[in-house]
Design a protein with these regions (language model features):
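Exposed, low-structure sequence patches enriched in small/polar residues
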Residues: 1-369
Length: 370
């Protein structure tokens, strides 16, 4: 058992604002360009791409904007006593206090500039409003990192996240359905309770900074679906033997996926804006400002799949997949690369479906699949 007295108070204030601006758009392409494409052979001039380009408009205003601000804090105190009755030594007891205060702001923007194009950005920042005093070196650094806005103390940033998304599903042709997405995510954390501050430029020069850790990720996904039946009708007509043969191939899907990630810890200086947006090459994931990442990785996958319906109720589906992975781990003398790869091929499935005649066993057995 323990003898203690505890008190606590807390507050929270939230401001949430959402806006759906009216549409403001301009023609996506000059009129002469749309007319020029329509005069090309029917395979292109009468495609969905040509029709869409003639009517497409570029929307300049976002479809949705949301801003959220959240202010929270608490004040708690706890005093522990030695005996269950009042004692003269109680006047020397110092309560243990905790008064965290934080201010978090988020911003989300959605845009649909064109049909089949989607953009999204999410930004969040959290600030620590506490005054850590000057009793320790890292507390003094935390105090010096504090900022003010319009004469009000707004503390220092302890967390930041940044996410982006770009999606593309263009209407190229009725037989071709390409797709593509590019997304990124960034996270940064500063630790005001670390053991010691870090120098921005080596061990003996540069300003002191709070220990910082950050990471990012990038994912690229490209692919397309091909409808050979529609392609055959557009090239050879509906009654062609080639069209009927191509119609048996029901699905063709091609795709490429690439993931890149990296993590940094114990860093004094935050990364550049390009790293936060993941607009960098693989070398930028491995190192920033001369500092190697604690870990970094790049994984890519290529896949293809197809399915065909053959006579006599036979259906064949096949898949090809190739995966390569490369990971870099931090060591004392640099980074150690670890590579791996795998291939899934051949991989196929054959199914046979028979529907017996209603005049025989079909009365009790409607279909048989093997």
């Amino acid at each position: 058992s323990s003898l203690a007295r505890a008190t606590s108070r807390s507050f929270a204030v939230t401001l949430d604002y959402g806006l759906v601006p009216p549409s403001a758009s301009v023609p996506a392409a000059p009129r002469f360009l749309a007319r020029l494409i329509q005069k090309l052979p029917p395979f292109i001039g009468k495609s969905g791409f040509a029709t869409g380009l003639d009517h497409a408009r570029l929307r300049l205003s976002p479809t949705r904007v949301r801003v959220r601000s959240f202010l929270s804090g608490s004040d708690a105190a706890r005093t522990s006593f030695r005996v269950p009755v009042a004692d003269s030594g109680d006047v020397h007891l110092v309560p243990a206090r905790s008064n965290p205060k934080a201010w978090r702001n988020t911003l989300s923007i959605d845009m649909l500039p064109l049909v089949g194009v989607q953009l999204r950005a999410d930004v969040a920042s959290q600030r620590d409003l506490r005054d850590y005093g000057d009793s320790t070196p890292i507390a003094r650094v935390a105090r010096l990192a504090r900022r003010s806005l319009l004469g009000l103390a707004v503390g220092f940033e302890v967390q930041r996240t940044f996410g982006t998304f770009f999606g593309l599903t263009p209407q190229v042709a009725s037989w071709l359905r390409p797709r593509g997405t590019l997304s990124s995510g960034f996270s940064l954390t500063r630790d005001p309770n670390g053991r010691a501050p870090l120098r921005a430029a080596g061990d003996s020069a540069g300003a002191f900074r709070l220990p910082t850790a950050f990471s990012n990720s990038q994912r690229l996904d490209l692919g397309t679906q091909v409808d050979l039946s529609r392609l055959g009708r557009g090239l050879f007509g509906d009654a062609s033997v080639v069209t009927r043969a191509l119609a048996r191939v029901t699905t063709i899907d091609l795709g490429l996926t690439r993931d890149r990630t990296s993590t940094f810890s114990g860093v004094a200086v935050p990364p550049g804006f390009g790293y936060q947006l993941a607009w960098i090459g693989v070398d930028g994931f491995r190192s920033q400002r001369g500092v190697f990442a604690t870990s970094a990785a790049e994984n890519s996958t290529r896949h293809a799949s197809a399915a065909a319906s053959l006579p006599l109720g036979i259906r064949v589906s096949s898949t090809y997949q190739w995966t390569r992975g490369l990971t870099w781990l931090l060591r004392a003398d640099g980074q150690l690369p670890i590579s791996s790869w795998s291939r899934e091929w051949p991989s196929a499935t054959v199914t046979w479906t028979v529907s017996p005649s209603r005049g025989t066993v079909g009365r009790v057995l409607t279909s048989l699949t093997a």
